[in-house]
Amino acid sequence: MAKVTNNRNRKPRKKVCILSAKGIEHVDYKDVELLQRFINNNNKIASRRVTGASARMQRRIANAIKRARFVGLLPYVKE
């Protein structure tokens, strides 16, 4: 019979931010491909828990997404 493992004792793996892993310091609002990674299916900004970003990078990401939406590069709502 197979041995059943208990996953409750394991610590969850810490998510690594895509930006810090690539060494990106500045988040540009014109880089739509990068910003779309931080938006979920309903075009909402993903939380830090989902993205694994630090507080500072999450603020920069959110501001860049808001600027891109204002300029018209990203949609506000799902089509």
From Swiss-Prot:
Keywords: Ribonucleoprotein, Ribosomal protein, RNA-binding, rRNA-binding. It holds the Pfam family Ribosomal_S18. GO terms for cellular component: cytosolic small ribosomal subunit. Transmembrane segments: none annotated. Binds as a heterodimer with protein bS6 to the central domain of the 16S rRNA, where it helps stabilize the platform of the 30S subunit. Part of the 30S ribosomal subunit. Forms a tight heterodimer with protein bS6. Belongs to the bacterial ribosomal protein bS18 family. This is Small ribosomal subunit protein bS18.
